[in-house]
Amino acid sequence: MDFNREEIINRLLQLDRDMALIDTTEDIYSCVIVGGGALVLMNKIYRSTHDIDSIDASKEIIPLLEAYNINMNVRAYVLSFPDNYRERVQKLEIGSKKINFYTASLEDLVVSKLNSMRDKDIDDISNPLVYNDVNWEVLDLLIEDVCYGMLNDYDVNNLRRNYSEYKEKYKK
């Protein structure tokens, strides 16, 4: 199934309503969306996405995430984000009550896409809505942070090369 922006929001709101039925306490939970779904939610790309990925969520909502096919098996993403990515998350104002939904920052998403470099990732970050809005100074720092945490020189060199080519092509 493919999801456009409205369908992603509807799914997140249904998840929020279901969590409110399960947990009637005042507790508020969180979920950070990454990948193409995050870019769709941020209105940076207008394609549909095959899945909704979450890099981080309150443990209490994980069973519901699985029931709603929100993918938490994104270990590859974890290595593409600096440890402090949570400082830059953007809250989604979609009217949820029980779960605060966030997206990773645009810069963190670009780094993760540069690290992956699948065709759809390249297409996503080649969109003017992405490269014209990205903070290049922040992106420079995040690339170095991610490279510092990588385990081998091959991956470091690939990410640096991908970023250098991206920056040369799109930075104005």
Language model features with spans:
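Compositionally biased terminal segments of proteins
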Residues: M1-K172
